[in-house]
Amino acid sequence: MNWRSEHVWVELLKGSRKRGNFFWACILFLGSLGFLSVGASSYLGKNIISILPSQQILFFPQGVVMSFYGIAGLFISSYLWCTILWNVGSGYDRFDRKEGIVCIFRWGFPGIKRRVFLQFLMRDIQSIRIQVKEGLYPRRILYMEIRGQGVIPLTRTDEKFFTPREIEQKAAELAYFLRVPIEVF
């Protein structure tokens, strides 16, 4: 969701609460539970789940490996669920022409630096950069170059849905709003 007026442009960012993350967290959790139950069944010598016959699986080495995969999958699934719960990467970009201030806010992992808040003066913005990498894994990233600070990414690196036309359109609108040039790399 974006909001724009004559003097203010606010762009909200979704973060880690995406359908794909929910899907993979569920698949990983259920798959790792299956592996762990087969490993436990082979250790106990009984079927814990009647769907998965595990009496033919020896505990050493197959049951141990299945248990290890199950535990590793639960750890990775827990990590995904925590990033979804904490909504890591969400936030907003606010460009205020009236006040001459740019604010960038993102949520991070819990801790001292959970809230990432950057604030710049608009006159310090040198340009809007577009980085385009074509090939097997194409990337189109929008950056803002700040005098004395370097470049700050405005789009996520995993967003592959931007077509060249969409990224050019977004860069042109933002550069026009901020009154800065566009650079392409």
Curated annotation (Swiss-Prot):
Listed GO CC annotations: chloroplast thylakoid membrane; photosystem I
Major localisation: plastid
Top-level taxon of the source organism: Eukaryota
A Pfam family assignment: Ycf4
Membrane topology: Multi-pass membrane protein
Coiled coil: none
Transmembrane feature ranges: 20-40, 57-77
Cellular compartment(s): Plastid, Chloroplast thylakoid membrane
InterPro entries: PSI_Ycf4_assembly
Gene Ontology biological process terms from the UniProt entry: photosynthesis
Keyword annotations of the record: Chloroplast, Membrane, Photosynthesis, Plastid, Thylakoid, Transmembrane, Transmembrane helix
Keyword Ribonucleoprotein attributed: no
Function: Seems to be required for the assembly of the photosystem I complex.
HAMAP family linked: Ycf4
Protein family: Belongs to the Ycf4 family.
Name the UniProt record assigns to this protein: Photosystem I assembly protein Ycf4
Naturally occurring in which organism (per UniProt): Agrostis stolonifera (Creeping bentgrass)
Lineage: Eukaryota, Viridiplantae, Streptophyta, Embryophyta, Tracheophyta
